[in-house]
């Protein structure tokens, strides 16, 4: 969150007033908000929230709202694997953007539960190399790992978009930006939303 102030929400109850930070208040409604670059710290928080919500009500929907430029592949896969591991149905919502690794999380929501708001964008691209340095042998090993990572991303996206890996590889060779409607047509999301769904 950087230097932003996290707002508090005041709730009046028969016992008096209670103050929560806004993210805790959203969590009490089974909403997880991912609004930053994905790194190990962010992944650990999101995973803990997913596991907590599953343990409290394993059959109830968890909504994951995404506005992220992407980030670490290993952190992404830790979140993605937890989303597929928990019993609770997972809805994903793209607000603003789901770029790079964050696009995989959007696509990884349960079928029929992947949404994109009407002015959001989704960006597909190759996993970043991170500007690695080292000996020629080290660089060769790093290049091999990058190819493995790219293949893993392609396989996950193929599973959720129903495109073949060759199509995904060609589309991800350079950054490819989708409007909300294009993201649905491509299979990264199921529906464009202008207004909130009635939650059940």
Curated annotation (Swiss-Prot):
Query: Which InterPro entries does the UniProt entry name for this protein?
Result: ClpP, ClpP/crotonase-like_dom_sf, ClpP/TepA
One Gene Ontology term from the biological process aspect of the record: protein quality control for misfolded or incompletely synthesized proteins
Classify the source by domain of life: Bacteria
The residues annotated as the active site are 100
Report the PANTHER family cross-referenced here. Answer: ATP-DEPENDENT CLP PROTEASE PROTEOLYTIC SUBUNIT, ATP-DEPENDENT CLP PROTEASE PROTEOLYTIC SUBUNIT-LIKE-RELATED
Q: Which family does it belong to?
A: Belongs to the peptidase S14 family.
**Physiological role:** Has lost one of the conserved residue (His) proposed to be part of the active site. Therefore it could be inactive.
Q: Know the name of this protein? A: Putative ATP-dependent Clp protease proteolytic subunit-like
Q: Which organism is it from?
A: Streptomyces coelicolor (strain ATCC BAA-471 / A3(2) / M145)
């Amino acid at each position: 969150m950087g230097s932003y102030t996290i707002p508090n929400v005041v709730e009046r109850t028969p016992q008096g007033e209670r103050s929560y930070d806004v993210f805790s208040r959203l969590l009490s409604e089974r909403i997880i908000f991912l609004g930053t670059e994905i790194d190990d710290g962010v992944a650990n928080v999101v995973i803990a929230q997913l596991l907590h919500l599953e343990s409290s009500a394993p059959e109830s929907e968890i909504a994951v709202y995404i506005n992220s430029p992407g980030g670490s592949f290993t952190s992404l896969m830790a979140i993605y694997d937890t989303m597929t591991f928990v019993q609770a149905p997972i809805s994903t919502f793209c607000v603003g953007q789901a770029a790079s690794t964050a696009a995989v999380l959007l696509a990884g929501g349960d079928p029929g539960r992947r949404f994109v708001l009407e002015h959001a964008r989704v960006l597909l691209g190759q996993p970043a190399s991170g500007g690695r340095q080292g000996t020629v042998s080290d660089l060769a090993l790093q290049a091999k790992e990058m190819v493995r990572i790219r293949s893993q991303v392609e396989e996950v996206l193929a599973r959720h978009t129903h495109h073949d890996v060759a199509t995904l590889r060609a589309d991800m060779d350079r950054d490819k930006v989708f409007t909300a409607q294009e993201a649905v047509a491509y299979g990264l999301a199921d529906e464009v939303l202008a207004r909130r769904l009635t939650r059940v």
